[in-house]
Amino acid sequence: MESQQLHQNPHSLHGSAYASVTSKEVPSNQDPLAVSASNLPEFDRDSTKVNSQQETTPGTSAVPENHHHVSPQPASVPPPQNGQYQQHGMMTPNKAMASNWAHYQQPSMMTCSHYQTSPAYYQPDPHYPLPQYIPPLSTSSPDPIDLKNQHSEIPQAKTKVGNNVLPPHTLTSEENFSTWVKFYIRFLKNSNLGDIIPNDQGEIKRQMTYEEHAYIYNTFQAFAPFHLLPTWVKQILEINYADILTVLCKSVSKMQTNNQELKDWIALANLEYDGSTSADTFEITVSTIIQRLKENNINVSDRLACQLILKGLSGDFKYLRNQYRTKTNMKLSQLFAEIQLIYDENKIMNLNKPSQYKQHSEYKNVSRTSPNTTNTKVTTRNYHRTNSSKPRAAKAHNIATSSKFSRVNNDHINESTVSSQYLSDDDELSLRPATERI
């Protein structure tokens, strides 16, 4: 009989991953009326032994035991309150039943044979090689016709996985969860599951399968005990015990927030202002940083903000340091008002400087080129000013030429003067009367 065979081979129950969820009653194909009265008690005793053995037999896993590593005990997770997990492209309950996942609603019964652990710290079953999920970037998408014949097959490895994939350490406290989840995400990426992990924008490259979800659930439960999880993680898991992907998505978002906090502190500590930008722009930049830190429960006092701003002032704004050095009650709004006042004064001065310089230069040019002036020095200086851009050789040539020309003109003027005087004397002699010669 079948029950007697089970009694004779009790180890056959351990060969299946679903031994812990089989029925407690062993059906028999034999007609009970055909059994003699003498054999009925023995049949009952055998059935009782088999049933008692089933009750005492612990649930086994399809992952072979590794004597070099002790796997942490899975934490107790509360049962789901909002029904089955239907997100992220998971299998429907009908498909799960058809795939022998009969106990989809019970987290303790989510057996996942070769997905249970990482290949780095458990030796996988040679009959069930660990599949990899990330195809190479150069490979084309598979033919949809061939997908129908691949439901019953075990996925083959598409890319290599390093042999040094290390498991994440076990979570030890609620405060260390943000650090622990970084190692857990790195562990999933090294296990070729990085394309189902949300990126910085909360986006994923593809939908995960039910087996991948079971693998993520089991490893998360094994290394993160429920009583050590933060409150916000417990709230998510109490609504849906298996929604690990939402936990990872919010964890990535919180990482980005922490990185932004660090960037804001660095920007606030390195503030610099010299008036090259408008005072309004500087005030908006500083106020935005302070408000962003305040939203993350980090309050920056006015005194601290004023000290950081004063440290970065330069140029005409530098004297504000001495003004605020002895002040104990610093107001950020007052400091911004004084910076704005100095900026406006400098702006007005810069607008008036070009017009004053233009009027003064025009007045100088008119005085130098006035036709009524008799000052030759001004004209000569203006002449040399126009040729100031010429090289020294050209200047020397011009000076020599001008001196030679002036010397020739002077000689010509002297000769003309002498000749005119001589002619005048001759005229005077010719006009004298003859009586005067005697």
UniProtKB/Swiss-Prot annotation:
GO cellular component, alphabetical, reads: cytoplasm
Q: Does the keyword Transferase apply?
A: no
Span list, region RNA-binding: 295-397
Compartment annotation: Cytoplasm
**Molecular function as annotated in GO:** RNA binding
According to the record, the segments passing through the membrane are: none
Compositional bias ranges of the Low complexity kind: 369-381
Extra information: Retrotransposons are mobile genetic entities that are able to replicate via an RNA intermediate and a reverse transcription step. In contrast to retroviruses, retrotransposons are non-infectious, lack an envelope and remain intracellular. Ty2 retrotransposons belong to the copia elements (pseudoviridae).
Q: What does this protein do?
A: Capsid protein (CA) is the structural component of the virus-like particle (VLP), forming the shell that encapsulates the retrotransposons dimeric RNA genome. The particles are assembled from trimer-clustered units and there are holes in the capsid shells that allow for the diffusion of macromolecules. CA also has nucleocapsid-like chaperone activity, promoting primer tRNA(i)-Met annealing to the multipartite primer-binding site (PBS), dimerization of Ty2 RNA and initiation of reverse transcription.
Protein name (Swiss-Prot/TrEMBL): Transposon Ty2-GR1 Gag polyprotein
